[in-house]
Amino acid sequence: MNAIDLNSDVGESYGAYTIGNDEKIMPYISSANIACGFHAGDAHVMRETVARALEHSVAIGAHPGLPDIGGFGRRNIDISPQEGYELVVYQIGALWAIAKAQGGKLHHVKPHGALYNMAAADQALAEAIANAVYDVDPNLVFYGLAGSALIAAGKKAGLKTASEVFADRTYQADGSLTSRRAPNALITDAKEASAQVLRMIQEGKVRTQQGTDVKIDAQTVCIHGDGAQAVAFAEQLKGELERHGITVKAGNC
């Protein structure tokens, strides 16, 4: 593989609260997942983040989440597939309008947090979300956890998909991410994160917390924009990729 997408979750500030490192991380990524007001973000932050993405020629993506600002969208909420569909259509629509007003357009959609993790393991919810994306714009790329129900649902709906891997998270033997509540869920060393990503890209494998290797399809790499090491990770990772002849560009264009 000679090209890979680097994405980051951004636009997660709201009101008087500043979250993340959007301005500093934007030069190192190729696609931005912008919060749409439910788990984080607001109209002003969305507009500013779209403008920043356009300035850096970064692909604009909607990052719809559960309506849970207090929990940052990382707490499970029992929703039906129909509710999932409606939440996603609503949030894509909000960012679509803000992007269009500035001469931009949406490139992709990536669910956030608990919505992402719930749908990755729930085919009915994953299909509802994928259908929501398709019904808004069948040309949008659908980002989802590699090997999960999200990718299967995106393909079934007729969407282009981008299988996502994580630079700053560890993996379990079934290919799932280690729960944030578990020990060693996060990778805090930039060199370790870069080594994990390079192996996923070059060998299609990742070492799990159980000490085994599992196969993984890496088409887009996430660096969490709210992490303490986000900017250092992005700078280190982009440099390592380029040194190995791997171009950074938006996923599945």
From Swiss-Prot:
Its EC number is 3.5.2.9. The keyword Nucleotide-binding applies. It holds the Pfam family LamB_YcsF. It is an enzyme of class 3 (hydrolase). GO terms for biological process: carbohydrate metabolic process. The keyword GTP-binding does not apply. InterPro entries: Glyco_hydro/deAcase_b/a-brl, LamB/YcsF/PxpA-like. Keywords: ATP-binding, Hydrolase, Nucleotide-binding. Forms a complex composed of PxpA, PxpB and PxpC. Belongs to the LamB/PxpA family. This is 5-oxoprolinase subunit A. It comes from Shouchella clausii (strain KSM-K16). The lineage of its organism: Bacteria, Bacillati, Bacillota, Bacilli, Bacillales. The gene is pxpA.
